[in-house]
Amino acid sequence: MKRNTNVSSSRRKSRKAHFTASSGERRIRMSAALSHDLRTKYNVRSLPIRKDDEVRVVCGDNKNHEGKVVACYRKKYVIHIDKLTVTKTNGNTAQIGVSPSNVILTKLKLDKDRKALLERKNRTVAADKGKVKVSADVN
């Protein structure tokens, strides 16, 4: 049974939302999980990826590669990592695009906005844990 009636489970609508998403929506969709150390430190599970974060690829052909994020290509939903390149036939090098779902964040670039985001997400998690679930027996 569907839990939220405002969210469509239609393939057609999901694809349309994916391909017509604005840059701000794509930023949220391009989130990645935090490493275990960062997760325990900040009490946050995932964050949107940004330039200068350090990541580790955990699945795909480039598994176990680590590096700094050089660019977030929102139009293609990929990120570029500094040490992941391929040499083309003409001798030039090109970046390999990696899906954000295939990486985990190992080191964050923190500025005042990112710190505020972490604090805000941590506060909502703490508030949810403080709530007591009450179940009513209907007989």
Curated annotation (Swiss-Prot):
GO biological processes: cytoplasmic translation; ribosomal large subunit biogenesis
GO molecular function annotation: RNA binding; structural constituent of ribosome
Any Pfam family matching the protein: Ribosomal_L26
A GO CC annotation given for this chain: cytosolic large ribosomal subunit
PANTHER family assigned: 60S RIBOSOMAL PROTEIN L26 FAMILY MEMBER
UniProt family annotation: Belongs to the universal ribosomal protein uL24 family.
Name of this chain's protein: Large ribosomal subunit protein uL24
Lineage start: Eukaryota, Amoebozoa, Evosea, Eumycetozoa, Dictyostelia
